[in-house]
C-alpha cells in the first residue's frame, strides 16, 4: 500500500510515544504536514517519566524528508489547545485534514486488580479528564477548521472495539467513552462532510511494553517466554498505517461512526506491519477465549 498525502495537514494529539508517535511518523512519511503535540519536551518530561519527547517524534519524520512541527501542548488546558489551532489556522491557511486524538496519560492513574470502590477516586476522575475530556477539548477547537472546508477526518484512538469489560471500571469508562465520542462526532459532522471514527490497535509493542518485557523491537519474540500472547502482538506502526489508509480513502465517510481495528483495516486496505506480517489480534483473542 502506498498513500500520497502530500498537501494535507494533520494534528496528532499525544504524539510523544506509542501509537501517537507512529501515526505522526506514518502521516509525515506519506507527505502530510504534521503537528506533533504532547506534554513531554526535551528537558521537561511529563508525569509519565518516560524518555520520549515530541521533538524526537518530529525528528523521525524530518529525517525521512517529511515536515513536522513539534508543539508542546497539554490538551486538558483549553487555552493551550486554542493556541495550537490558532497557530495551525495561521500557518496552514485554515487547512486541517486529519485530527488524531491519542492523548492518554492514564497509565500512572490505573490501579489493576481492585474493585472500583477501592480504586483511588481522584486517580479515576483524573483519568477521565486526561483521556476523555482532552479529546473533547481538542475536537472542540480543531473540528471547526474542517467544517469550514467541508472535509476532514477525526480519529479517536482507543483500546478495544467492543462493549466487553476492560478490566477496571475507570479504564473501561475512558476507553468506551472515546468510542462514543467518535459515534457522536460522526452524527453531528456528517452534514458537514467530516468523518469521525474510533480505532484500536491489538496487543501493541509500545516503548513501555517493550521495556516491561525487557526486550527491544529487534528481539521482541524473546518476550513470548514470559507471555505467550505476546506472539500475536503488533508494532505501533501497524495501527498507524491504518490511519494513513483511512486518511487517503476518498470514501472514508462510509466508515464514519464506526469502531475500527488495525487487523480488519489491514485486510481491507492491504497494508502490513513493518515486518511484512498482518497480525490479527481479534481472531487470536477470540480463539483463546473459546478454548
Where are these regions (language model features)?
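Short-chain dehydrogenase/reductase
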Residues: 2-94, 104-117
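Active-site loop of short-chain dehydrogenase/reductase
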Residues: 8, 66-67, 94-96, 146-160, ...
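Rossmann-fold NAD(P)-dependent oxidoreductase module
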Residues: 22, 26, 141, 188
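A glycine/serine/threonine-rich, flexible loop-to-helix segment
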Residues: 49-50, 114, 191, 203-230, ...
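Catalytic loop of short-chain dehydrogenase/reductase
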Residues: 105-109, 117-123, 127, 153-191, ...
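A short, exposed helix-loop element centered on a Lys and neighboring polar residues
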Residues: 139-140, 183
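C-terminal helical subdomain
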Residues: 198, 217-291
Amino acid at each position: 500500500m502506498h498513500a500520497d498525502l502530500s498537501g494535507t495537514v494533520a494534528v496528532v494529539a499525544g504524539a510523544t510515544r506509542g501509537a501517537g508517535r507512529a501515526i505522526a511518523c506514518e502521516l509525515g512519511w506519506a507527505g502530510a504536514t504534521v503537528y506533533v503535540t504532547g506534554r513531554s519536551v526535551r528537558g521537561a518530561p511529563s508525569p509519565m517519566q518516560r524518555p520520549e519527547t515530541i521533538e524526537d517524534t518530529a525528528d523521525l519524520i524530518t529525517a525521512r524528508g517529511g515536515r513536522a512541527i513539534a508543539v508542546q501542548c497539554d490538551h486538558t488546558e483549553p487555552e493551550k489547545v486554542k493556541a495550537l489551532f490558532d497557530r495551525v489556522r495561521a500557518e496552514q491557511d485554515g487547512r486541517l485534514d486529519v485530527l488524531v486524538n491519542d492523548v492518554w496519560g492514564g497509565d500512572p492513574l490505573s490501579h489493576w486488580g481492585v474493585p472500583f470502590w477501592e480504586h483511588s477516586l481522584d486517580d479515576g476522575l483524573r483519568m477521565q479528564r486526561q483521556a476523555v475530556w482532552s479529546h473533547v477539548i481538542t475536537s472542540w477547537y480543531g473540528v471547526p477548521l474542517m467544517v469550514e472546508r467541508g472535509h476532514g477526518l477525526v480519529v479517536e484512538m482507543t483500546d478495544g472495539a467492543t462493549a466487553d469489560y476492560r478490566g477496571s471500571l475507570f479504564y473501561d469508562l475512558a476507553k468506551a467513552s472515546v468510542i462514543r465520542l467518535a459515534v457522536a462526532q460522526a452524527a453531528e459532522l456528517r452534514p458537514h462532510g467530516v468523518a469521525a471514527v474510533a480505532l484500536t490497535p491489538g496487543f501493541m509493542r509500545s516503548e513501555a511494553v517493550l521495556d516491561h518485557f525487557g526486550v527491544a523491537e529487534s528481539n521482541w519474540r524473546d518476550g513470548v517466554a514470559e507471555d505467550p500472547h505476546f506472539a500475536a502482538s503488533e508494532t505501533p506502526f501497524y495501527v498507524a498505517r491504518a490511519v494513513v489508509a483511512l486518511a487517503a480513502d476518498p470514501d472514508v465517510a462510509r466508515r464514519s461512526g464506526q469502531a475500527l481495528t488495525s487487523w480488519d483495516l489491514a485486510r481491507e486496505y492491504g497494508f502490513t506491519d513493518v515486518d511484512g506480517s498482518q497480525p490479527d489480534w481479534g481472531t487470536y483473542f477470540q480463539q483463546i477465549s473459546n478454548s
